[in-house]
Amino acid sequence: MESSASTSASTSTADVVVIGGGPGGYVAAIRAAQLGLSTVCVEMDKTLGGTCVNVGCIPSKALLSSSEHFEFAKHAAAAHGIGIGQLSLDLSTMLKRKDDVVAQNTKGIEFLFRKHKITWAKGFGTLKPGNVVEVTTGGGGGAGGPPAQKIATYQAKNVIIATGSVPIQLPFLKFDERRILSNVGALTIPQVPKHLIVIGGGIIGLELGSVWSRLGAKVTVIELLPAILPGMDDDVVREADRILRKQGLEIRIGTRVTNGGLTDTGVFVEVDKAGATERIEGDHVLVSVGRKPATSGIDVAALGLNVGKRGEILVDDRMRTNLPNVYAIGDCVPGPMLAHKASDEGVVAAEVIAGKPSRMHYKSIPGVVYTWPEIASVGLTERQVKESGREYRTGRFPFSANGRARSMGDAVGFVKMVADARTDELLGVHMLGPNVSELIAEIVLAFEYRGSSEDIGVTVHAHPTLSEVTKEAALATLGRSLHI
């Protein structure tokens, strides 16, 4: 496809204008530019990378890693013959390291934009009828901010909406990012709190709760549902709950938060469990009850854009909306709000625009929880398979029977497989254990090719490695596990 870009006195044209520079948007822009399309990416933040790189995936993993080192030094180093002496924590250095990691990543994205000659339009993008994108200062002049000033206007041959998501607030706990925190504020607490209250026992709540727990905070996790980690396999949830409690997290399930606010020294929440009410006070409260699509620059009614009940933009497996030459990707479309999903959707959108036969495969998107031990999964849970009426069999193998896990001192958790009883096709794989975020990739590849447990079981895995647990779980599914 021939690239074309021109500029008039008031309007520039481009083959592709991407609204949003997060993991979906910036990847879409890079792929579009690789395919020879003149590309503009509109991003209002000072740095590219969106929530994931700036205040999500990357900084949280930096803190998780630092806190795991601290935990090792405090509790496990002696068993390896390593004497630490008097252990101390320099939180300001830890937070600076986190910021440095983020800066390295954002600067890397800027370099890639320069390399591929992508125009970064620094401002707030608004999609107008006819695929016109206006770029203004600030957040579009809303929410009591200064009036928006137009920076640029683009006539786009194709538009990719990649506006991401925002955390959901509770009506009585509005984010101030000092005491009442979203994921953003939870990454910058200036000193280890004595008591951190976490509302929501999902991925964000447990990951960030684990960080501050390891660093010395009392952490209380309050979950409305009967179990933490909604949507995960029941066996994984039970074991994760047990391990996290053993690590020191106070987990309250089946508990509703009915009220909350600030005190003179911190915060309070009021909770109700089966009619019994209680007031809990702490230094900070992290509200992690989910996220919602962010589409403030997209007037869906005026545009005639089809959206779902949560405001998510409806698309097909080629990321096409109901409007001609308008695509949408990432957290603002249906499906799990995952950075890797957004990135792959960005690639698909760019390739479809370029005329390639690309489409998304939603069946094989992995999910990871970066607690310790880690949790990873792909496909259906055993409960989902059972409820479908499909005949199946399962196999399970523990890390406690794996030589590498024992040599590392991290022999907890297991790998569990669910396979079709007749065809042996893998239907779901669920992992809890050391470094399973890396082990799940093998299974995702098998899912792409509708692989079987036997495909995994007959594949030679290096010894001694953690990946042997995956092989043994596959063999267990076939009834012939070797080491248990």
Where are these regions (language model features)?
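Beta1/beta-strand and adjacent pyrophosphate-binding region of the FAD-binding site
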Residues: 10-22, 192-202
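Glycine-rich flavin
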Residues: 2-7, 11-14, 30-192, 220, ...
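Gly/Ala-rich phosphate-binding loop of Rossmann-like dinucleotide-binding domains
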Residues: 29, 33, 209, 213-214
